Amino acid sequence: MILVKDAIINGKKQNMLVEGNIIKKIGNISNSEVSKDETEIIDGKNCVLIPGLINTHTHVPMSLFRGVADDIPLMDWLSGHIWPMESKLNEKIVYAGTLLGTIEMIKSGTTAFNDMYFFLDSIIKAVDETGIRSTIAYGMIDLFDEEKREKELKTARESLEMIKNLNNSRITGALGPHAPYTCSKEILESTNALAREFNVPIHIHMNETLDEINQVVERTGMRPFEYLNSFGFFEDVTTICAHCVHLSDSEIQIMKEKNMFAAHNPVSNLKLASGVSPVLKLLENNIPVTLGTDGCGSNNNMNLFEEIKAVALIHKGVNLNPVAVTAKEAFEFGTKNGAKALNINSGEIKEGKLADFVLINMKKPYLTPKENIESHLVYSFNGVVDTVVIDGKIVLNAGKMVNIDEEKVYELAEEAYFELAK
C-alpha cells in the first residue's frame, strides 16, 4: 500500500490510498483502512498531486541524438544526419539511450510513452528497469523493396510475440510502419492484418511535411490519408497518427470517421519548420488530440510540460483566439486523451484508476501563488517534479530515481554517443 497524506488532489487538500496498482480511495482515510506494516507513506504537504503525463509519440533511444543536427529541414535532417547515425545503432547504444530517455521522462512527470524504434529487446530491458509504462512498436521501413518488406514484417511479428509473452501489464505492443512515403502498400496492408490479429494499435507518422505529402500524391494520385483509406488501412484498428500538420478537409473527415487519434508534436514541428497542426479543426470534428515530444533529435528534450505550454500558446497566436486551446484542454491532451489513445486506465486521479501519478512541490516561485496552481502547471511550470508513482510503485522519490543509478546511466550515455558519432 501507499498512503499519500495532505496533498492537493483535484483542487483540495486530502489523502489518497493506493492498494496494489490501483487508487483505492481519495479523501478521509481511517487507520483501520491502512496496514501499518506494509504501507509506504508519502508526505504530500505543500504538494499538488496530478495524473502522470502520457507521451504519445516519441523515439526514446534518440535521447543520444540531442543537439546533433539543429536548424535544418526534416528531409535534410533525416537523410544527412539521423539515418547515417542510425546505421551505427546496436543493442548497447539503444539500451543506453532508452535509459537516459526514460529517466528524463520520469523526472519531468511522464509515466507512460508510445515509442517507435529498433532493437526492442534493449528498449524493453531499460523500460523494465526504470519502471515506466510503455507501448512499443518496431519501426518498419521497407522503401518499396520486397525482400526488405518480408524482413520488416517478420521482425514486427516476432516483436509483438515477445512483448505478449512478457506478460507485463506495463509493457504493451503496437505496430509501427514509419510513414506512407517510406512504406509500400503491401507492408501497410499487412500492418492492418497484424494489428487485428494481435489486437494492438497502429502508430504511424502522417502528414508531417508538405514534401512527404507531395511524394505520396505524385506516386498514388491521392493525399496520404486518402491513399491509406483506399485499401482499408484504418479499418477495425486504433490508429495513433503522429504530427498531422498539413491536413485537407477530406483527410480530417477520414480521421473522424475512423476514430483516429492525433499525436500533436508542437515543439518538434516548430523546430523543423514543418508547420502547425490545425488543432482547432480537429477539435471541431471531435478528433482526440494527444501530445508527443518526438525524439530528442528534433525537440531537443522529452519534457511534456513544454508541449502542454506550447499547444496552449501556439494555437492562440495562429488563430488570433485567446481561447483556442485552453489550459484545461492542453493539460488533458497530455493526460486524459493520451490514456484513451493507449488504452490505459489512467490520465485522471479517480478511485479505480491505475496508480500512475506525480507529486510536485508548490513551494517554488513559478508555482506561487498556489491558489492558481492549475494555470501554473500549464503556463509557468518547468517540469521538475518531486515524486513519481507508476503502477503503484514509487520510481522517483524526492527527485531521485529509485531503481536506477543515474550516474552510471550518464556514463553509459556518453560512451554510447562517442560510438555513434565516431
Swiss-Prot record:
Chain positions recorded as Zn(2+) binding sites: H57, H59, H205, D294
Biological process annotations from GO: S-adenosylmethionine biosynthetic process
Transmembrane segments: none
The keyword Signal is assigned to this record: no
Protein EC: 3.5.4.41, 3.5.4.31, 3.5.4.4, 3.5.4.28
Needed cofactors: Zn(2+)
Further comment found in the protein's record: SAH is a product of SAM methyltransferases and is known to be a feedback inhibitor of these enzymes. As a result of this inhibition, organisms have evolved efficient enzymes to metabolize SAH via different pathways. The pathway found in methanogens differs from the canonical pathway, it uses the deamination of S-adenosyl-L-homocysteine to form S-inosyl-L-homocysteine for the regeneration of SAM from S-adenosyl-L-homocysteine. 5'-deoxyadenosine is a radical SAM enzyme reaction product which strongly inhibits radical SAM enzymes.
Protein known as: 5'-deoxyadenosine deaminase
